[in-house]
């Protein structure tokens, strides 16, 4: 994220060179930085390429993160099906899912695909980076909303948001996750 902000700020500074303030109309500096950051994100939605030991490290972090999300979601599934759900266990699992989901955008830089090592991440992730990034953002949002529902303690709301989170996971996994090896 810091890289995108820096790129956006650089884009703003370069685009502003030689222009007087009144030439900018009513576009604020904030909106110009946001536009630059958005353009930078669109140009490289999965981040900068990595290789070697760094690629292997990211792949390991990705694998462990996804395993942890899966383990936490198993707790959620068990509890929401229970006649007497343990909301505390759901809250803990939801917080873990949300925390990890917010990190997931950095788990798929170019150079961490199936040609590098064992992974269930399909090559299509890097062939369709904008679609993948959009699905990842939807997952992050669903995880955030699920966590908010868990904090509320309302089991019906928790169940509804768990369904939405499951759909977000499935949308990405159906397109971008290979079967187990």
Placement of each model-derived feature along the sequence:
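Extracytoplasmic c-type cytochrome modules immediately beyond a signal peptide or single-pass transmembrane anchor
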Residues: 39-164, 179-181
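The canonical Cys-X-X-Cys-His
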Residues: 165-177
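Processing junctions and N-termini across compartments
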Residues: 11, 163-166
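Sec-dependent signal peptide recognition
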Residues: 1-8, 22
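Short, non-ligating residues that shape and space the ligands of small metal-coordination modules
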Residues: 23, 178-179
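C-terminal motif of bacterial Sec signal peptides marking the signal peptidase cleavage site
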Residues: 14-16
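Bacterial lipoprotein signal-peptidase II cleavage site
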Residues: 18-26
């Amino acid at each position: 994220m810091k890289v995108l902000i820096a790129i956006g700020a650089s884009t703003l500074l370069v685009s502003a060179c030689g222009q007087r303030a009144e030439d900018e109309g009513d576009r604020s500096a904030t909106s110009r930085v946001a536009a630059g950051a958005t353009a930078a994100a669109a140009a490289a939605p999965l981040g900068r390429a990595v290789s070697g030991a760094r690629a292997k490290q990211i792949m390991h972090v990705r694998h462990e993160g996804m395993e942890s999300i899966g383990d936490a979601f198993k707790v959620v599934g068990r509890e929401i099906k229970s006649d007497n759900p343990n909301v505390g266990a759901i809250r803990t699992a939801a917080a873990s899912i949300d925390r990890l989901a917010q990190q997931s955008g950095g788990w798929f830089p170019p150079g961490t695909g199936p040609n590098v090592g064992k992974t269930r991440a399909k090559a299509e992730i890097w062939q369709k980076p904008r679609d993948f990034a959009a699905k990842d953002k939807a997952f992050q949002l669903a995880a955030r909303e699920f966590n908010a529902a868990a904090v509320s303690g309302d089991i019906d709301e928790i169940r509804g948001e768990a369904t939405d989170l499951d759909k977000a996971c499935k949308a990405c996994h159906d397109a971008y996750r290979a079967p187990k090896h």
